[in-house]
Curated annotation (Swiss-Prot):
Underlying gene: hhuA
Positions of region (4 X 4 AA tandem repeats of Q-P-T-N): 26-41
Further comment: This protein is subject to phase-variable expression associated with alteration in the length of the CCAA repeat region. This mechanism is called slipped-strand mispairing. Addition or loss of CCAA repeat units would change the reading frame and result in introduction of stop codons downstream of the repeat region. This may be a mechanism of regulation and a way to avoid the immunological response of the host.
Renumbered ranges of motif TonB C-terminal box: 1029-1046
Protein family (similarity comment): Belongs to the TonB-dependent receptor family. Hemoglobin/haptoglobin binding protein subfamily.
Ranges for domain TBDR beta-barrel: 196-1046
Ranges of the Sequence repeats in the UniProt entry: 26-29, 30-33, 34-37, 38-41
PROSITE patterns per record: TONB_DEPENDENT_REC_2, TONB_DEPENDENT_REC_3
Name of this protein: Hemoglobin-haptoglobin-binding protein A
Residue ranges occupied by any TBDR plug domain in the UniProt entry: 61-188
GO molecular function, one term: siderophore uptake transmembrane transporter activity
GO CC annotations on file: cell outer membrane
Subcellular location as annotated: Cell outer membrane
Alphabetical UniProt keywords: Cell outer membrane, Membrane, Receptor, Repeat, Signal, TonB box, Transmembrane, Transmembrane beta strand, Transport
């Protein structure tokens, strides 16, 4: 019934439009382009002016301009009206484009026309944003374990003036990466607000129940003489996105079967500052500072290597703490010239310096302090001023561990009186049964000729006494009840030297009390040493072995909790110069709008991994290492150094800096030319061409660049120098040879690589009638292989990856045709498209390669990135909008809209493309008061089920499955959103919205396909489906905001 009603709405839109076309009295003028810095209505209010600056590209219900083929432009008013808080909300009511889900790290770019992430270009003010490490081998090795924040960053919605979404191959504006499409963000400018006055101020507060997000945005703009400036400062603070049924799930469950969303505290801080100097109408200088920082701190309770804590308390269990960040900084300088010359009407030169760092930090430690294992001191042990062991009551402790025996005199009657020897006359078996386990020797105390009628025998029963007395209580350490009071780890044998902090001992003395097994106490000598400004007592080794000699007692062995941590940073730093020119020409009866220019950029991409272990909650009894050096000097004059067994002690605060990627500097040069020209009022063409040249220069400097682990590359290509790796701990000389071998192999890998590509787009627009438009487009785009796809190397017997310096650039060609019916009432556009991808980069199994290991050749299962032949995506779309107020005055302000996308795709002819979204329809009903005092928007979104035959599990063979489809998919669903706003006074706007009005339980396909078949993160129980509720979208939720404008 729901589908029938929704389809009826779509038919009503088209029927109304057709009727409007038939009875239209006036033709529709063709739209004209307007510069974004020129106002279209000097009499509008400030909030309207921001929208009116971008009339051509606006996406407002009141704008019935037919859309350009495969392009959507959303100005600032649209996301503001929809109360969008992130890029997912930005495309919430769009079809054919979705946001890629990345688990705890949030979103990672867009999915368009069967491809996603790096194959959909993302730009902010013309600058490419950070790409993911797209090597499939890297993703399979590391991404499934939650160790890398391998995501694409995004923009703060409140800073955006305009968003341009292009579908299909089009590298003219975006260069490398726009295979499936592109998303371009343009930030706000002071000129957008300062039309009729010299100042503007706005303050907005908002709240979202889905993730408990609080929003604050302050916007200030002003002009003084030749200067103008704008500042947009935004702060967002919230928590994890609450999945459907969030409050009903058990919060104590950990692991893959956890149904409740993992807890995170998320913040997002953004500052956009622009300062401009415009001494004349034709010259303008600007400085831009764009700062963006996103943080997420919490716990990976769904991490599969953690135990289930349903019946335990969190503070006593080691937990995985996460601290993820995205930090983007951009400093830009711009010069604009508006003087009309034979070569340009506008000229813009800009220089940008952008640095983006994505960080993933994990810390594994216990939160409970003294409640944690081996951390407490339940007996209150301490050493007094005489360094004697006492309890909480201050009385001396006592210890005894002795072996004694009990003698029982037995008189055994003769059972065999006729035997010659006395001991043979006794039944010894009966005595053994009486004293099981006690050695019995057949021997009588009496002589053989003794006249007595019995045999005397002393039974010696061994007896062990092991007691510990403290706080006035004696513990029998041999009993079940007390045996764990003092563990072996608390008894420190004195055949070794120990290093204790003087915080717990009186270092004015020179001994510490020890206990002999027989119960007597002895003084263990120590000397005081100083390290890093702190004093320690170094005890003397007084025993010959571990079993003999006295013991020193401590509350526990370690005296601290261990924090195992890793921090992995992916950094992209870009320096870019752009030259952009526009020119309008009239040649005969044709009009040409030219845009041309070029860019040069230099981008450095690198990875830095730091991992280690550090102590937490350090107690006075902690045993410090004598030395943290890797090697210890030889004990003999000419001997070789030896590895220090204490070098990995947690109290050394160990850390190791390394990388899995070779740093690469990418240099890009590009030239482009675009001509939009109109022959007459019925025929228009556009043509564009772009040439890109990309060069990769690996920059690996031994000793300076974060080290590539030797075992990843040794003996890969170069076999010299040879070394003996059969030894567990290599001596220094062999270690140097191994490092030299690794350096030689890295040098063989890091060879420069160049790519060049030509991109183009050809299109036409035909308007044979004033209500009919035909559009056609043919475009080509490319994506150069990322540096990690070329150079990434990994060596392991089960999964090795070899670099591939022969990779070719991926290409895409799109053909698209659109038919539009339009007039002042609205429009209906139907388009069909066909995109062909070539040279898709994918991971392929290359067989067994023999690698020199442990002085012999060992077969390694080897993979390599290769170019796949082709992939194809086809589909069709509908976009419709009608203003009912144009039909009858009674319905003035009421608008209907409809969008629909269907697409299907395959790789190599038969492998489904998982990035393709199911069939999606969005129906909209909108009302806006003629004076803009209030308005309502109602959206119906229907998404079909993801069919099994349209999914592909690339690991089905490894999982032992015959079916290559993905088991857990999204079902069909329909959601309803109701949004509204009211302006009670001129300067105040109140907004509110109800999302998922019917409280429908559903999972999106992008969320379902983020579930991984293996790893430790984003996992569920694949057999039962337990844990999948964690991936469901929120139930009914609300948003509200209040905004003051002056």
């Amino acid at each position: 019934m729901t589908n029938f009603r929704l389809n009826l709405l779509a038919y009503s839109v088209m029927l109304g439009l057709t009727a409007g076309v038939a009875y239209a009295a006036q033709p529709t003028n063709q739209p004209t382009n307007q510069p974004t810095n020129q106002p279209t209505n000097q009499d509008g209010n400030v909030s309207e002016q921001l929208e009116q600056i971008n009339v051509l590209g606006s996406d407002n219900h009141n704008d019935n301009t037919p859309p350009k083929i495969a392009e959507t432009i959303k100005t600032a008013k649209k996301p503001e009206k929809e109360q969008a808080q992130d890029v997912k909300d930005l495309v919430r009511y769009e079809t054919g484009i979705t946001v890629v889900e990345a688990g705890r790290f949030g979103n990672s770019g867009f999915a368009v026309r069967g491809v996603d992430e790096n194959r959909v270009a993302v730009q902010i003010d013309g600058l490419h944003q950070a790409e993911t490490i797209s090597s499939q081998g890297f993703k399979e090795l590391f991404e499934g374990y939650g160790n890398f924040n391998n995501t694409r960053n995004t923009a703060e919605i409140e800073t955006l003036k305009q968003v341009t979404i292009r579908k299909g191959a089009d590298s003219l504006k975006s260069g490398s990466g726009a295979l499936g499409g592109s998303v371009s963000f343009d930030t706000k400018d002071a000129r957008d607000y300062l039309l009729n006055k010299n100042y503007y101020a706005s303050y907005k507060r908002g709240y979202n129940t889905a993730d408990n997000q609080n929003l604050q945005t302050l916007t200030l703009a002003g002009r003084y003489k030749y200067f103008d400036a704008i500042a947009v400062i935004t702060s967002r603070k919230g928590h994890e996105l609450e999945n459907y049924g969030y409050k009903n799930y058990n919060d104590r469950i950990q692991g893959r079967e956890r149904e409740k969303a993992d807890p995170y505290r998320r913040t997002q801080e953004s500052k956009l500052l622009k300062f401009a100097f415009q001494p004349t109408e034709n010259h303008r200088l600007s400085v831009v500072v764009d700062l963006y920082k996103q943080t997420s701190k919490g716990h990976d309770f769904s991490y599969t290597l953690k135990q289930n804590t349903e019946h335990m308390t969190y503070d006593e269990v080691e937990l995985r703490h996460t601290n993820d960040k995205v930090d983007r900084k951009n400093l830009a300088f711009t010069y604009e010239n508006f003087t009309e010359t034979p070569f340009w009407d506008t000229l813009k030169i800009s220089y940008s310096h952008q640095k983006i760092t994505t960080t993933a930090r994990t810390d594994d430690y216990c939160d409970g302090n003294d409640k944690c294992a081996l951390a407490g001191n339940p007996l209150g042990m301490k050493y007094n001023q005489d360094n004697q062991l006492v309890g909480e009551d201050g009385n001396l402790a006592k210890y005894k561990d002795i072996n004694t025996k009990q003698t029982i005199h037995e008189k055994l009657p003769f059972t065999k009186p006729n035997e010659k020897w006395r001991y043979n006359r006794v039944d010894w078996d009966a005595l053994k049964k009486k004293y099981p386990g006690v050695p019995i020797y057949a021997s009588c105390i009496e002589e053989n000729n003794d006249p007595s009628k019995y045999c005397s025998y002393d039974v010696e029963i061994p007896k062990k006494e092991n007691t510990f007395e403290i706080n006035g209580k004696q513990y029998d350490l041999l009993s079940e009840a007390d045996k764990n009071v003092i563990s072996d780890e608390q008894r420190l044998p004195t055949n070794s030297s120990y290093l204790f902090s003087c915080d717990g001992l009186n270092c004015d003395k020179d001994t510490i009390q020890g206990f002999e097994k027989k119960g007597t106490t002895v003084n263990i000598p120590f000397v005081v040493i100083e390290k890093n400004g702190k004093k320690y007592a170094k005890t003397e080794a007084v025993a010959n072995n571990q079993l003999s000699g006295p013991y020193i007692f401590m509350p526990s062995k370690t005296g601290y909790q261990t924090n195992l941590w890793t921090q992995r940073d992916l950094t992209s730093e870009t320096k870019q110069i752009n030259l952009d020119l526009t020119k309008h020409l009239e040649l005969g009866k044709t009009q040409h709008d030219l845009s041309y220019g070029g860019l040069w950029s230099e981008m450095e991409k690198s990875m830095t991994n730091i991992s280690g272990d550090s102590p937490m909650n350090v107690k006075w009894w902690a045993q410090y290492p004598h030395s943290c050096d890797i090697f210890l000097p030889s004990s003999t004059p000419n001997g070789a150094p030896t590895l220090n067994p204490e070098r990995t002690n947690t109290l050394c605060n160990n850390s190791n800096v390394y990388s899995f990627l070779i740093p690469v500097k990418t240099k890009t040069g590009a030239l482009y030319f675009i001509n939009d020209f109109r022959v007459n009022s019925h025929i228009a063409f556009n043509f564009g061409y772009r040439y890109d040249r990309v060069k990769y220069d690996p920059e690996y400097i031994p000793g300076k660049t974060p080290k590539i682990p030797d075992d990843m590359v040794v003996n890969l290509y170069v076999k010299q120098p040879t070394f003996d790796d059969t030894k567990v701990n290599l001596p220094p000389e062999e270690l140097r040879k191994k490092e030299a071998n690794a350096a030689a192999n890295i040098k063989a890998i890091v060879q420069p690589k160049k790519f060049s590509a030509s991109s183009y787009s050809v299109g036409t627009t035909l308007d044979p009638l004033n209500w009919l438009r035909l559009q056609a487009k043919y475009g080509k785009a490319f994506r150069a292989p990322t540096s990690d796809e070329i150079y990434f190397t990994f060596l392991h017997p089960d999964f090795s990856i070899r670099p591939n310096r022969d990779l070719q650039a991926e290409t895409a060609k799109t053909k698209e045709l659109a038919l539009t019916l339009h007039n002042e009432i609205g429009y209906v556009t139907t388009s069909v498209f066909d995109t062909r991808y070539r040279n898709f980069i994918d991971l392929a199994y290359k067989g067994l390669y023999n690698v020199q290991r442990h002085s012999k050749l060992t077969p390694y299962h080897t993979y390599q990135n290769v170019n796949r032949p082709n992939a194809k995506v086809t589909g069709w779309e509908i976009a419709a909008q009608i203003s009912l107020g144009k039909i009858t005055q009674f319905l003035n302000g009421l608008n209907l809209s409809y969008k629909y996308t269907y697409q299907k795709g395959r790789i190599d002819g038969n492998i489904p493309m998982n990035a393709i979204q199911p069939k999606t329809s969005v129906y909209g009903v909108s009302y806006a008061h003629p004076a803009d005092k209030f308005g309502l928007d109602l959206y119906f979104t229907h998404v079909s089920a993801k069919n099994a035959e349209d999914t592909y599990n690339m690991f089905y063979k490894e999982e032992g499955k015959k079916d290559s489809t993905i088991k857990w998919r999204s079902k069909s669903y329909t959601t309803i959103d109701l949004l509204g706003y009211i302006k009670p006074i001129k300067n105040l706007t109140l907004r509110a919205g109800v999302y998922n009005l019917t409280n429908r339980k559903y999972i999106t396909w992008d969320s379902a396909r983020s579930i991984r078949p293996f790893g430790t993160s984003n996992m569920i129980n694949q057999k039962t489906g337990e844990g999948i509720n964690r991936f469901y979208a929120p139930g009914r939720n609300y948003r509200m905001s209040v905004q003051f404008e002056f």
